[in-house]
């Protein structure tokens, strides 16, 4: 300062370049050019801090829309990610599946779903979800965070000649998590293992907003071990109430 003929710099922004600095991305920077408002020029920096690795996934993935030849893996993240699913009949020789929309990966939302197809009926498969936070997504510049991976999970596809299976059906839970936990404990005590789980209405009641809906869905999915057991959520009359109703 002074602004029109600067002799000194009194504003600065500094970041100590250690390992933690890798978790910070500079989005933009500049100088506020307002000579009539001040006798010096303030500088600014817009930065983004990466999400902690253990907080990138909202919860475990869950299995949806299973058929004799495929399944959909769904999950939410706390930041937009570049994501894919590794899968195979073991955890060593695996393939990769990801979602493409008109030839591009849809990296613009925290809702993620990846379809795994062309599988063999009756086979057991293992899978895990991998993700990199999209820290910067510009036309000619991309910055991704480190790769975060879930634990390995598994599922078995139904075969056309399957005659017997076990389905567990919950309904009207109305956010009474203690009731669901008690019912799940009864199943465990009696050695009953579900091949499919159905939430038959009024299990995600009166969703207030997106965060509430995501939280409630993931509570149900964890309770049903939906990372390994395919689930179906059926809309009831209470799911269509409130401002974020389905």
Identify the function of each model-found stretch.
Residues 1-55:
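Metal-dependent phosphoester-hydrolase catalytic domains
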Residues 3-10, 38, 68, 78, ...:
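A structural signal for well-ordered alpha-helical scaffolds and beta->alpha junctions
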Residues 1, 14, 39-48, 75, ...:
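Active-site beta-strand/loop signature of hydrolases that rely on acidic residues for catalysis
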Residues 2-5, 34-35, 63, 159, ...:
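Short secondary-structure boundary/capping segments
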Residues 17-18, 28, 159, 171, ...:
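Residues at the C-termini of beta-strands that transition into short coil/loop
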Residues 1-9, 16-24, 57, 99, ...:
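Long, structured stretches of catalytic cores involved in phosphate-ester chemistry, encompassing
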Residues 162-181, 188-246:
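Active-site neighborhood of divalent metal-dependent phosphoester/pyrophosphate hydrolases
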Residues 41, 47-169, 174, 185-194, ...:
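Acidic, histidine-bearing metal-coordination/catalytic regions of metal-dependent phosphoesterases
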